[in-house]
Amino acid sequence: MGNMLKGEGPGPLPPLLQQYVELRDRYPDYLLLFQVGDFYECFGEDAERLARALGLVLTHKTSKDFTTPMAGIPIRAFDAYAERLLKMGFRLAVADQVEPAEEAEGLVRREVTQLLTPGTLTQEALLPREANYLAAIATGDGWGLAFLDVSTGEFKGTLLKSKSALYDELFRHRPAEVLLAPELRENEAFVAEFRKRFPVMLSEAPFEPQGEGPLALRRAQGALLAYARATQGGALSVRPFRLYDPGAFVRLPEASLKALEVFEPLRGQDTLFGVLDETRTAPGRRLLQAWLRHPLLERGPLEARLDRVERFVREGALREGVRRLLFRLADLERLATRLELSRASPRDLAALRRSLEILPELKGLLGEEVGLPDLSGLLEELRAALVEDPPLKVSEGGLIREGYDPDLDALRRAHAEGVAYFLDLEAREKERTGIPTLKVGYNAVFGYYLEVTRPYYEKVPQEYRPVQTLKDRQRYTLPEMKERERELYRLEALIKRREEEVFLALRERARKEAEALREAARILAELDVYAALAEVAVRHGYTRPRFGERLRIRAGRHPVVERRTAFVPNDLEMAHELVLVTGPNMAGKSTFLRQTALIALLAQIGSFVPAEEAELPLFDGIYTRIGASDDLAGGKSTFMVEMEEVALVLKEATERSLVLLDEVGRGTSSLDGVAIATALAEALHERRCYTLFATHYFELTALALPRLKNLHVAAKEEEGGLVFYHQVLPGPASKSYGVEVAEMAGLPKEVVERARALLSAMAARREGALEEVLERLLALDPDRLTPLEALRFLHELKALALGLPLGSMKG
């Protein structure tokens, strides 16, 4: 916009618009919301942008010589509109009036009081319940990736070796906003690829190194702190930086998180997180997400988590009591941050008081071993100082209890006496003047006044000074009324100032307990997750898993699918084996694979699992190729994505990994597909992974591998068509039932019948060809063949087996 504003007219900008342009030019990357009375307004091109984004009516600001477009939103609805704008990708600069209009000498002074971006929010009304990460990425000695949640102060990062590992961590944390180092911003190919994968706001900041560790990571830390300080007006509440290693947790690549629908659904709305989220607090919800992002590798911490969940499973009354109390808690973690930033409102302190009142009850249920900090002193202070239902803003007044502050009480008494004067005045003047309808009133324009109706105008004393004439009444004032009124205004200003002083002292008292509040929030979040997992376990019949070398699941179920449909449980037993799962489409092979992985994942966050009995190894990674994450929009074919994900499996999977493969090789010719699937099966068998491989390639079921096991999903042809039993049974499937599934899908009858005829003919030809191949092999004397003749003979046999013309396989 520069120093110009889109509009019409020959004259200079009016003072209000000059002020708008000056503030707008300081924040060129932001949409400036400029307070004018009870509205936040935009002018010029920004008004057009705002109107388009929110569907507002575009009006015009008109002065003597200048007209410009104008659009605005009511201040009372700011939170709702701001949330929408942030989701649309706007950065918002909020310019408030910082002095009362009646006290301004000329134009009301305005200043930008808030800079709002998706990744730097602290306002409770605008924040999601989930973690709200700002991320920064830099390069150097690897990929430096750091995260900051400004609302909680969480500050962490890691150094990654590859771009794929970077993308995995970003997908795992799902930041709301990302800062890219200059070398990445200038790389157009990287930015284009990044935007396709992560539709989040990309922002800029100086990447000056800060902290300790590798350079790339220090640059990322510096960028986060610089950007956060800029948007927070220099104030920041950040915990010490925590370096974490993704390798210290179960490896869950992006493809696995997607295929297993851990956080985001492939279809519909159901996810694993949604199934598990019976938490009662926002910190508990965020902790459960963190556990799912980073499952544990070590048995000790897992058993400790399971012990706590089991206690809540066994003690139903305790579980219900704890969950009932937790439901009343405020978000203490974020409240502590607002205290440290000096942004906590009177209602925040009231929410803190209600939360602290719950802590003794929780201690009574759980005992002192729960380890909650002693915050009784702060609770007593808040109880003594704060009214039951304080206003949102300090400026609204009436938030400090009577009896808490002697100076404030004295001012209030003096003010009450002043108000009493006006109440007494009405009775006195009625008696003195003999005007029965006389009354004392007040409005913002004239202040206090005496009102007399028309029939009594003749009785109005001479000292009454008229201030307003209405249709059937007149309003007057007296010199002593104005003097008393001025004294009331003075007392109101003093009361307001003193209340603010008392509130700030109270907030400072609470701020000193911010770390204790964070510790309480951490303990309560863990309790919340344990109780939530126990609630899920009891409600849906989960069992405590055991850890060992073999994988044994009895009557296992898919935790998400069973919520929406009747579910057939299945058993599985394996140990460092390759398990081939065959059967028709729609029979449940993919569901069986996914439920096995989800049971393993649940066990390694410390949850009970959906099964009658479960013994599981401690997996170091869960790898999938289930066809859910094809990148067609990114220009990659299904087959290319499939091969990339398989390549990752072969690169990373170990004998302690769980590998799920579904129909690998189907994106190319059947010959290529069989060859690739066979080679992959052999490689994973050799690596001793725990592998579940669903396939239509029946050739794989006959592989001569010592640790290969065949399972199939049962189906049967009956008079009404194909029936799926969804039972997983030993041995390979007898046929694929492809034509029958096509008929169930609604293909026209003539197409289905033609397919059956073709299938019969091809099967007959193939059987005849195989017989001919066998006959020719039996008649062959290999000792009498030259090498060239042997090669030609093999080509002919292959052509016969495939039903191709002889000679077509040469060259």
UniProtKB/Swiss-Prot annotation:
Signal peptide: none annotated. Pfam families: MutS_I, MutS_II, MutS_III, MutS_IV, MutS_V. ATP binds at G583, P584, N585, M586, A587, G588, K589, S590. GO terms for biological process: mismatch repair. The keyword DNA repair applies. InterPro entries: DNA_mismatch_repair_MutS, DNA_mismatch_repair_MutS-lik_N, DNA_mismatch_repair_MutS/MSH, DNA_mismatch_repair_MutS_C, DNA_mismatch_repair_MutS_clamp, DNA_mismatch_repair_MutS_core, DNA_mismatch_repair_MutS_N, DNA_mismatch_repair_MutS_sf. Keywords: ATP-binding, DNA damage, DNA repair, DNA-binding, Nucleotide-binding. It comes from the Bacteria. GO terms for molecular function: ATP binding; ATP-dependent DNA damage sensor activity; damaged DNA binding; mismatched DNA binding. Belongs to the DNA mismatch repair MutS family. This protein is involved in the repair of mismatches in DNA. It is possible that it carries out the mismatch recognition step. This protein has a weak ATPase activity. This is DNA mismatch repair protein MutS. It comes from Thermus thermophilus (strain ATCC BAA-163 / DSM 7039 / HB27). The gene is mutS.
